[in-house]
From Swiss-Prot:
Protein name as it appears in the record: DNA polymerase IV
Gene name for this UniProt entry: dinB
Cofactor: Mg(2+)
Region described as Disordered: 438-465
Species this protein is from: Cutibacterium acnes (strain DSM 16379 / KPA171202)
EC number: 2.7.7.7
Length: 465
């Protein structure tokens, strides 16, 4: 266990159900259940409104329907959940390079590895406030609970304390160093990592219901009942001793910074200033990682959603802000801005662990005397990601999936059967839409991809599929 509260745990609130409520205005404030649609289906997530009726994850769909017959049961849209998850994880990686995702909606962050004053509790509180605000903005309305503590165990306990149903209006909780043992003492033994239903039942038979009970028990008794490894671990955790490190799931192969603009940009000087600023931020992260880059990339998304990118590969490796900025601006000079730019990004890749001398030189005015290798890629964005979906079984319309009707517009499936698809024509950011039933074989009815989020994570934060 550390002497500072330097581990953060983020947990998205009712994640799948919250994504559905965000994207379907008519479901805001209503009981929403994701999963459990089929006769033998199981609930994946229930909104807080549905939980008031006793519905919870892993419950049989049939039981959930008995408890909340008027809830909206949706089949789930993994594409939307994955996109929002990538945005959340990318936001966490801005705090620290050490992020350990546990699932799509949950992760640990080692704040000591980032640029955070972990000695200052007020500063840590502010980090959590700003993190929640950024997540809400970038996911366009999703909420999360944040816990901070001196270990993974404490951070997880803190995030549970911060949950909306616990009464924390700011959804932030911090367990100060030195208070850990007292904080966890009254909690159920089930709060200890690794204690599931079977272990909890065995502890119950020993009369050990709370963490304080476990702490007071003889270690030999626990080892005899649970085995040496489990018993010893349980004793240590009950005493708030937890040295498990935050382990990043992967090493980033590139570092980039990009912004999407509210209005398309056409002025070259404005774009140049943005590119130079991005290059400086990228270099700051590059230096923090202790690496040097050989490839610099400039990315742009045009007003028509065409994605343009250009890369320069050096014969040496550098972490110089001036050098990387110079190359990025040089590539910007070849970009036609007349149609407008909606996104600009600067990235570096092809890492080395030491600086390497370049085999070409630059004159006093910054002109390259020997050209590095340049590659260029222009990719038209197809309508698939936000328009009609190409691969979909049109004979099957699961509740909740996205659709587009040539006459009525974008919406989602409320229900289907007997050759009829009942649709609600609304989408994220729209007014509550009207409900209309159309024939299943209506040629104007098309499956659709979900609307994309405006903020997209830098390329290194998008794992390859």
């Amino acid at each position: 266990m550390r002497s500072t509260a330097s581990i953060l745990h983020l947990d998205m609130d009712a994640f799948f159900a919250s994504v559905e409520q965000r994207d379907k205005p008519s479901l805001v404030g209503k009981a929403v259940i994701v999963g459990g649609v089929g006769g033998r289906g199981v609930v994946a997530t229930a909104s807080y409104e549905a939980r008031k009726f006793g519905v919870h994850s892993a419950m049989a769909g049939s039981q959930a329907r008995r408890l909340a017959p008027n809830a909206a049961f949706l089949s789930g849209r993994f594409e939307s959940y994955r996109e929002s998850s990538k945005v959340v994880m990318a936001t966490l990686r801005e705090l620290s390079p050490l992020v350990e995702p546990l699932s799509l909606d949950e992760a640990f962050v080692d704040l000591e590895a980032g640029d955070v004053d972990v000695e200052n509790l007020d500063a840590l509180q502010q980090v959590a406030v700003e993190l929640r605000a950024r997540v809400a903005e970038r996911t366009e309305g999703l909420s999360c609970s944040v816990g901070i503590g001196s270990s993974k165990f404490m951070a997880k306990v803190a995030s549970e304390m911060a949950k909306p149903q616990r009464g924390h209006t700011d959804q932030i909780a911090l367990i100060a160093p030195g208070t850990e043992a007292d904080t966890i003492a009254p909690l159920s033994a089930r709060a200890i990592p690794g204690v599931g239903p079977v272990t909890a039942e065995r502890l119950e038979k020993l009369g050990l219901r709370t963490i304080a009970d476990v702490r007071a028990a003889r270690e030999s008794e626990l080892v005899h009942e649970l085995g040496h490894a489990s018993g010893a671990s349980l004793v240590a955790l009950s005493r708030a001793r937890d040295d498990r490190p935050v382990v990043a799931s992967r090493i980033a192969k590139s570092i980039s910074v990009e912004d999407t603009f509210e209005h398309d940009l056409t002025h070259r000087e404005e774009c140049r200033q943005i590119v130079e600023r991005h290059a400086g931020l990228v270099c700051g992260r590059l230096k923090k990682s202790g690496q040097f880059a050989r490839t610099v990339t400039l990315k742009a998304k045009m007003a028509d959603f065409t994605v343009w990118s250009r890369s320069v590969t050096l014969t040496g490796a550098t972490d110089s802000p001036e050098r990387i900025s110079q190359l990025a601006v040089r590539m910007l000079d070849s970009l036609d801005l007349r149609e407008g730019v909606r996104l600009l990004g600067v990235g570096v890749s092809n890492f080395a662990t030491s600086a390497q001398e370049e085999l070409f030189v630059v004159d006093d005015e910054g002109r390259l005397l020997d050209e590095p290798e340049v590659t260029e890629e222009i990719t038209p964005i197809q309508p698939g990601p936000f328009g009609r979906r190409r691969s979909f079984d049109g004979r099957n319309w699961p509740p909740g999936v996205d659709l587009i009707h040539d006459e009525y517009g974008r919406g989602w499936v409320w229900g289907s059967g007997h050759g009829i698809v009942t649709c609600r024509f609304e989408y994220r950011g729209s007014e509550i839409g009207r409900v209309k039933s159309v024939p299943q074989d209506d040629e104007a009815l098309h499956p659709a991809h979900p609307l994309p989020l405006a903020w997209q994570p830098p390329q290194e934060d998008v794992p390859s599929e």
